UniProtKB/Swiss-Prot annotation:
Belongs to the class-I aminoacyl-tRNA synthetase family. Glutamate--tRNA ligase type 1 subfamily. It is found in: Cytoplasm. This is Glutamate--tRNA ligase. A motif ('HIGH' region) lies at residues 10-20. Pfam families: Anticodon_2, tRNA-synt_1c. The gene is gltX. Catalyzes the attachment of glutamate to tRNA(Glu) in a two-step reaction: glutamate is first activated by ATP to form Glu-AMP and then transferred to the acceptor end of tRNA(Glu). It comes from Pseudomonas putida (strain ATCC 47054 / DSM 6125 / CFBP 8728 / NCIMB 11950 / KT2440). It catalyses: tRNA(Glu) + L-glutamate + ATP = L-glutamyl-tRNA(Glu) + AMP + diphosphate. InterPro entries: aa-tRNA-synth_I_cd-bd, aa-tRNA-synth_I_codon-bd_sub2, aa-tRNA-synth_I_CS, aa_tRNA-synth_I_cd-bd_sf, Glu-tRNA-ligase_bac/mito, Glu/Gln-tRNA-synth, Glu/Gln-tRNA-synth_Ib_cat-dom, GluQ/Sye.
Length: 493
């Protein structure tokens, strides 16, 4: 009997997302319920955004939750390497096989040519897609351009008509017209694969039998299915999980909810409660109980109990469930966990240099730096009153800084400062006009340790959470203001 093998393949391009943890949990439970294996693979082909720091955060977040893997970059295994950036020769080999078999082709089109192609198609009311012009080149011309070292990509051929049937374990057969599919790039001009080629090659070579992934990938499933057909490989069983959503039913995003697992760890949530809550996202126990452990979820896991309705990720409900777990702990364990959370040595070492020179006794540390150990702060609206800025300008400054910080890929003091500086310059203000607002929102005080250092230490999700909290306190942002300020944001370098 074939061993069930599932996997999670996150990209190390930022803080570990609760959506990644959600998909990892369901893959883990499915594998373990069938006595199988769970694999961790790192999709780091985006060389500009991928970092080893983010990769380590993924490891730490999953382990904090209690999700362990049988094979992966840090534990090894018989199917490595488990980082896509280390598998370049493998992808090149299989891409060349597709070209030689007539299933893929070299494309030398420049970015300017592709942009013009899209513009002309849109002007005609057509859906933008590659028009196949590279297929008109002779074999001799292709070889000449390859020999000359011209930049190129490799694209897959796709049918221009007909229907692709996607067998989904949750929805049954899903029919998707081929004319919606583009001639997907498989190998980029930097020699690295795109998601589609790497995904299929890796899943096959690593013996993945079942793929549980987010439903946002369902519309592009025909490309993956066609690649399996081209290679002559058996495709894994496919299961497209419903997406996590905000309480307003929009797709879960950091603009409306903290999305980093690290944020919830920092806020003092229990990993058992977090897993329990993620397990209830579109799934339920046979007896409908609300509180259950990872082991209990594995024991009773059944895909047929997954609901296709968009599961709502609600922090208030998560907090309620966390309280259930917290209050049922033995007092000794509660005290031990509290100590481990509050006096985490790594976190303390980040904070200590910023408070040590400002206190005379240890008892003064809490009033000065207590905000480092809090989640939501009790903010005072009076702290946001400004002699130079109107109430509307105060909200505008905070909102624009929040938006700029949301686009920040590397969370470093210098880059945080750059975001704030860019906003104040665009508004023709001084840095000293904005910093009191940052102190008020981030520390809950008029002055404290360097607020820029504090923002770096607190991390992106908690920083953004507090800025949103400040905006809510000050009355929020109207739809009209949101529209106007987003236009202004687009002009800020």
């Amino acid at each position: 009997m074939t061993t069930v093998r599932t996997r999670i393949a996150p990209s190390p391009t930022g803080d570990p997302h609760v959506g990644t943890a959600y998909i990892a949990l369901f893959n883990y439970c499915f594998a373990k319920q069938h006595g199988g294996e769970f694999i961790l693979r790192i999709e780091d082909t985006d060389q500009l955004r991928s970092t080893r720091e983010s990769e380590q955060q993924i490891f730490d977040a999953l382990r904090w939750l209690g999700i362990e893997w049988n094979e992966g970059p840090d534990v090894g295994g018989p199917h490595g390497p488990y980082r896509q950036s280390e598998r370049g020769e493998i992808y090149a080999k299989y891409a060349k096989e597709l070209v030689d078999a007539g299933h893929a082709f070299y494309c030398f089109c420049t970015a300017e040519e592709l942009e013009q192609m899209r513009a002309e198609q849109q002007a005609r009311g057509e859906t933008p897609r590659y028009d196949g012009r590279a297929l008109l080149m002779s074999a001799e011309e292709v070889q000449r351009r390859l020999d000359a070292g011209e930049p190129h990509v490799i694209r897959m051929k796709v049918p221009s008509e007909g229907i692709c049937v996607v067998p989904d374990m949750l929805r049954g057969d899903v029919e998707i017209p081929w004319d919606r599919m583009d001639m997907q790039v498989l190998m980029k001009n930097d020699g690295l694969p795109t998601y589609f080629l790497a995904n299929v090659v890796d899943d096959h070579l690593m013996g993945i039998t079942h793929v549980l992934r987010g439903e946002e990938w369902l519309p592009s499933a025909p490309k993956l299915i066609k690649l399996y057909e081209y290679f002559g490989w058996e495709q894994p069983k496919l299961c497209y999980m419903p997406l996590l959503r905000n309480p307003d039913k929009s797709k879960l995003s950091k603009r409306k909810n903290p999305t980093s697992v690290t944020f919830y760890e920092r806020m003092g949530f229990m990993p058992e409660a977090m897993l329990n809550y993620l397990g209830r996202m579109g799934w339920s126990m046979p007896d409908e109980r609300e509180k259950f452990s990872l082991a209990e979820m594995v024991e009773h896991f059944d895909l047929s109990r997954i609901s296709l309705g968009g599961p709502i990720f609600d922090i208030e409900k998560l907090s309620w469930l966390n309280g259930q777990w917290l209050r049922e702990l033995p007092v000794e364990e509660f005290a031990a966990r509290l100590q481990k959370w509050a006096f985490n040595s790594d976190y303390m070492m980040k904070i200590a240099p910023h408070v040590q020179g400002r206190v005379e006794t240890f008892s003064q540390v809490a009033p000065l730096g207590g905000f480092f150990f809090e989640g939501a702060l009790k903010l005072d609206a009076k702290l946001f009153e400004s002699k130079k800025l109107s109430a509307d300008q105060v909200r505008q400054v905070i909102q624009l800084i929040l938006w700029k910080l949301e686009s920040l890929r590397q969370w470093e003091k210098e880059r945080i400062t750059g975001c704030i500086q860019a906003v104040v310059e665009a508004l023709e203000l001084k840095l000293r006009d904005a910093m009191p607002l940052m102190f008020a929102a981030i520390t809950g005080q008029a002055s404290s340790v360097s607020v820029l250092d504090a923002m770096e230490i607190l991390g992106p999700d908690l920083t953004r959470y507090r800025l949103r909290q400040a905006l809510d306190l000050l009355g929020g942002v109207s739809k009209k203001e949101n529209k106007e300020w987003e236009k202004l944001l687009a002009s800020i370098a």
